[in-house]
């Protein structure tokens, strides 16, 4: 009897299926990497918001006070 699918066609179908599976794996891995990156950026944003930002604000406050003190000293020295 005759085969419905010839040898060349079966190899072609197998190659197409392999390509489809590879594409699906690439999409799944890409989505997983994007989720991981989103998590990392979220954690970094959280750390910056609650740890680094207050530290920067305190630093700026003391720096501004120091500059004001220097300005007052310079003004007092000139008088």
From Swiss-Prot:
Keyword Hydrolase set for record: no
InterPro entries noted in UniProt: E_protein_bCoV (IPR043506), E_protein_CoV (IPR003873)
Transmembrane segments: 17-37
GO biological process: disruption of cellular anatomical structure in another organism; viral budding from Golgi membrane
Alphabetical keyword list: Apoptosis, Host Golgi apparatus, Host membrane, Membrane, Transmembrane, Transmembrane helix
Gene Ontology CC terms, in alphabetical order: host cell Golgi membrane; membrane
All ranges on the Virion surface side of the membrane: 1-16
Subcellular location: Host Golgi apparatus membrane
Main location class: host cell
Membrane topology: Single-pass type III membrane protein
Domain of life: Viruses
Keyword Transmembrane helix set for record: yes
Residue intervals annotated with topology Intravirion: 38-75
Family listed: Belongs to the betacoronaviruses E protein family.
Subunit structure, interactors included: Homopentamer. Interacts with membrane protein M in the budding compartment of the host cell, which is located between endoplasmic reticulum and the Golgi complex. Interacts with Nucleoprotein.
Biological function: Plays a central role in virus morphogenesis and assembly. Acts as a viroporin and self-assembles in host membranes forming pentameric protein-lipid pores that allow ion transport. Also plays a role in the induction of apoptosis.
Protein name: Envelope small membrane protein
Native organism taxonomy: Viruses, Riboviria, Orthornavirae, Pisuviricota, Pisoniviricetes
């Amino acid at each position: 009897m005759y085969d419905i699918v010839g040898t060349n066609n079966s190899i072609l179908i197998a190659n197409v299926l392999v390509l489809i599976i590879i594409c699906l794996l690439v999409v799944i891995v890409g989505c997983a990497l994007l989720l991981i990156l989103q998590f990392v950026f979220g954690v970094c944003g959280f750390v910056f918001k609650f740890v680094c930002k207050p530290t920067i604000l305190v630093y700026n406050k003391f720096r501004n006070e120091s500059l004001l003190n220097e300005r007052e000293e310079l003004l007092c020295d000139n008088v």
